[in-house]
Amino acid sequence: MAKSTSSAPSQRMLRVGEQVRAAITQVLQRGDVRDPLIESTVISISEVRMSPDLKLATAYVTPLGVADHAAVIEALNKHAKFIRGRLGPHLRQMKYMPDVRFRDDTSFENYQKIDSLLRSPEVSRDLDRDSDEE
């Protein structure tokens, strides 16, 4: 049986990614990470993408209420090995504990740009014109 060459994540990658996301969320909520910047910031983890071999987890995070996202991401990456160690009790079924990387989630900004474009007068005029022709 040949392996699939599609770039879409497998069901297992999605399931494990969701489990890792929940585990990281619990570690951060409990306050296990002793860093003033992380402790004082509300951090939303929107998605965790797993590598095909499940050895690397990329967590997309959005620090809420902080202007300097890069500093929070840097602090999280500085404590990534500690966080990885705290994932063990939550992910007992994993053969290997994945390395964790944190990245800034820009999807919300992209959604806002698309929304503002759709609400612009030029686009709404074109949309109104299309609906009048039907």
UniProtKB/Swiss-Prot annotation:
Its main location: cytoplasm. Disulfide bonds: none annotated. Pfam families: RBFA (PF02033). GO terms for biological process: maturation of SSU-rRNA. GO terms for cellular component: cytosol. It comes from the Bacteria. One of several proteins that assist in the late maturation steps of the functional core of the 30S ribosomal subunit. Associates with free 30S ribosomal subunits (but not with 30S subunits that are part of 70S ribosomes or polysomes). Required for efficient processing of 16S rRNA. May interact with the 5'-terminal helix region of 16S rRNA. Belongs to the RbfA family. NCBIfam families: PRK00521.2-5, rbfA. This is Ribosome-binding factor A. It comes from Sinorhizobium medicae (strain WSM419).
